[in-house]
Amino acid sequence: MSVAFASARPRGKGEVTQQTIQKMLDENHHLIQCILEYQSKGKTAECTQYQQILHRNLVYLATIADSNQNMQSLLPAPPTQNMNLGPGALTQSGSSQGLHSQGSLSDAISTGLPPSSLLQGQIGNGPSHVSMQQTAPNTLPTTSMSISGPGYSHAGPASQGVPMQGQGTIGNYVSRTNINMQSNPVSMMQQQAATSHYSSAQGGSQHYQGQSSIAMMGQGSQGSSMMGQRPMAPYRPSQQGSSQQYLGQEEYYGEQYSHSQGAAEPMGQQYYPDGHGDYAYQQSSYTEQSYDRSFEESTQHYYEGGNSQYSQQQAGYQQGAAQQQTYSQQQYPSQQSYPGQQQGYGSAQGAPSQYPGYQQGQGQQYGSYRAPQTAPSAQQQRPYGYEQGQYGNYQQ
């Protein structure tokens, strides 16, 4: 199948003729038909082989088109094979577009994405996009996540709520975890987190609302939300970087309070909402009131003094992320305060696993913020029996 490609490639640019291009297009058409046929039969190995050949041909043709501005004059009228490429290609009138449509079709086949959407993207972007799309489709599933990632990371430092979504994966996790937590709230969460949070996460207010909804949702489905939030703990790290988040978090908390169910619980939620949407959920599940109170007290302290800690803990954060699963104080040696807090969290029903990360991210930061500065080890050592046990550290 690659004979034409092999024979045409060595030729110089000046030797590219309409016959060569037409031959390549015919070969690509045949390759596409073979790919579709094998795909219908479930022969993935053959599909992959033909797709690689088709990809090379398309890259070659795209290179020719890019290097030869007059290539349009050499291209034949739209070949009939374009009619077989699918609904997206039926409306295309240029051979170069046909090439793109073919490329997008092969990409769509390999990635399972709708060819029409790919076709449109390629056609609009031009020949140079052909090679790009070859790889893009394969990465689209992940890029869709990572695409918002940059927004998250940007928003993360800017807004408190963002931290949760600060990481590209965070947003996804949140939405997924939320899905597990609650179908309806989750959809809201996802939308807010994915859209308003990302785009407006920087604003923070929307994010707060979104998070507050998260917290509220978390309360509604505390157990499940806890599960969903665990992934968030890792996300939390994104917040580490920004002290703003903490400040915003306080605001967040305020909003959360209003949004949250009870003043005490809302506190906990708000607390976490900042970066601890999970916290809020879990808190509600834990022993919301006591935690909440401790949060209120410690929250403010941590916020105020904890910013510097944030940066410190950020390092811990990363450790915490890995260590989150182990809440042991030892895990967060650098974040000694974390451990204590984590322990406190840990004591609180199993949510700790989530908290650990969060605590490191924020809960710890709070507790450690205040105490870490003064005596992280001490805090560590004293997880503080606090009625909340979890937040004992905070209060101290």
Swiss-Prot record:
Location of motif SH2-binding in this chain is 50-53, 353-356, 391-394
> What is the reported tissue distribution?
Ubiquitous; with lowest levels in spleen.
An annotated GO BP = positive regulation of DNA-templated transcription
Q: Name one Pfam family in it.
A: SSXT
Task: Give me the stretches of Low complexity compositional bias.
Answer: 90-106, 199-229, 238-261, 311-369, 384-396
> Which residues does the annotated region (Disordered) include?
72-162, 192-280, 311-396
Where does this one sit in the cell?
Nucleus; Chromosome, Centromere, Kinetochore
Biased composition annotated in UniProt, kind: Polar residues:
107-122, 128-147
User: Which protein is depicted?
Assistant: Calcium-responsive transactivator
Species source reads Homo sapiens
